[in-house]
UniProtKB/Swiss-Prot annotation:
It comes from the Bacteria. Belongs to the RecA family. Can catalyze the hydrolysis of ATP in the presence of single-stranded DNA, the ATP-dependent uptake of single-stranded DNA by duplex DNA, and the ATP-dependent hybridization of homologous single-stranded DNAs. It interacts with LexA causing its activation and leading to its autocatalytic cleavage. This is Protein RecA.
Length: 357
């Protein structure tokens, strides 16, 4: 009898809790609007993370979701001439292919339109701003994000976002922490509207050295710690070597490490070629990733796909794939399938491949 009464009492308590929860949810929705709170179930749009390709198949795989996540803050940093802007322009080109509107906030005043066009960027549809101060740049970003019409914004770079107080002051004036305070305020203001508008904001950043570091890496990024916390993905990009054609250096081998990733496992690394004036080598990645995935066979110096030999040596194999876009498309689809990614939307044509040896 006592057990039955206890169960009945517990049942009433659970019913009271459920009613109290329903009442609280209804009050929140009345006060803040429908959708301000919801259950994170399978039907929730929050569960589906849309991604934009980086232009590098290997990096798309390393990121775990097939590219960089929409509606998030991204940081790409590295030493000078490591490929930061090149990688970002590839992302812009890929987003434009999907019909998205892209904006480039050129705080460094260093964007090369001819180079951007070579990477596949549609200059006629690209919005560009060259602000005078850091406050002006971030206010422009905030306005574009709140419009809901822009799907990708690039800020190049955080180091060039100079606070107004520093510009108006004398050359020798000390402005301690002014840029960090500016970035911290911008992150607090931007983060909610970025999520609502599903707009991706990429911040390109530079590296500085901390003084007096005895243990660990002395490297740090500019603009304080706020960006590190608010960024969903942080990419560390480095140049690891040169690519030569006889005596001429025609490109770089580049390594990218996923330092932070809130949407997939982090700390993955990928290497690819960046050719001078042309961008990321897609056929080079297909050869390397195809061998790793078992799609392309390598025997000695020969590369084979199925029963067909596609070239002796890596450069000859790349040349074969450039000349045979249907084979390149098949290899890419199989590589994507082996990593659980969506198939490519089309074949790699000669115009899409950015390597011309």
């Amino acid at each position: 009898m006592a057990t039955a009464n206890l169960l009945d009492l517990n049942g009433r308590r659970e019913m009271d809790k459920a009613k109290a929860l329903e009442s609280a949810l209804a009050q929140i929705e009345r006060q803040f609007g429908k959708g301000s709170i919801m259950k994170l179930g399978a039907n929730s749009p929050v569960m589906e993370i849309e991604a934009t390709s980086t232009g590098s198949l290997g990096l798309d795989i390393a990121l775990g979701i097939g590219g960089l996540p929409k509606g998030r803050i991204i940081e790409i940093y590295g030493p000078e001439s490591s490929g930061k802007t090149t990688l970002t322009l590839h992302v812009v080109a890929e987003e434009q292919k999907k019909g998205g509107v892209c904006a480039f906030v050129d705080a460094e005043h260093a964007l090369d339109p001819a180079y951007a066009k070579k990477l596949g960027v549609n200059l006629d549809e690209l919005l560009i701003s060259q602000p005078d101060t850091g406050e002006q740049a971030l206010e422009i970003v905030d306005t574009l994000v709140r419009s809901g019409a822009v799907s990708l914004i690039v800020v190049d770079s955080v180091a060039a976002l100079t606070p107004k107080s520093e510009i108006e002051g004398d050359m020798g004036d000390m402005q301690m922490g002014s840029q960090a305070r500016l970035m911290s305020q911008a992150m607090r203001k931007l983060t909610a509207s970025i999520g609502r508008s599903n707009c991706m904001v990429i911040f390109i950043n530079q590296i500085r050295m901390k003084i007096g570091v005895m243990f660990g890496s002395p490297e740090t990024t500019t603009g304080g710690n706020a960006l590190k916390f608010y960024a969903s993905v942080r990419l560390d990009i480095r140049r690891t070597g040169g690519i030569k054609d006889r005596d001429n250096v025609i490109g770089n081998t580049t390594k990218v490490k996923v330092v932070k990733n809130k949407v997939a496992p982090p700390f993955r690394e990928v290497e690819f070629d960046i050719m001078y004036g042309e961008g990321i080598s897609k056929t080079g990645e297909l050869v390397d990733l195809g061998v790793k995935a078992g799609v392309v066979e390598k025997s000695g110096s020969w590369y084979s796909y199925g029963d067909e030999r596609i070239g002796q040596g890596r450069e000859n194999a790349k040349a074969f794939l450039r000349a045979n876009p249907s084979v390149a498309g098949d290899i890419e689809d199989k590589i994507r399938a082996s990593h659980g990614l969506d198939f490519s939307t089309g074949e790699i044509g000669k115009d899409d491949d950015l390597v011309d040896m």
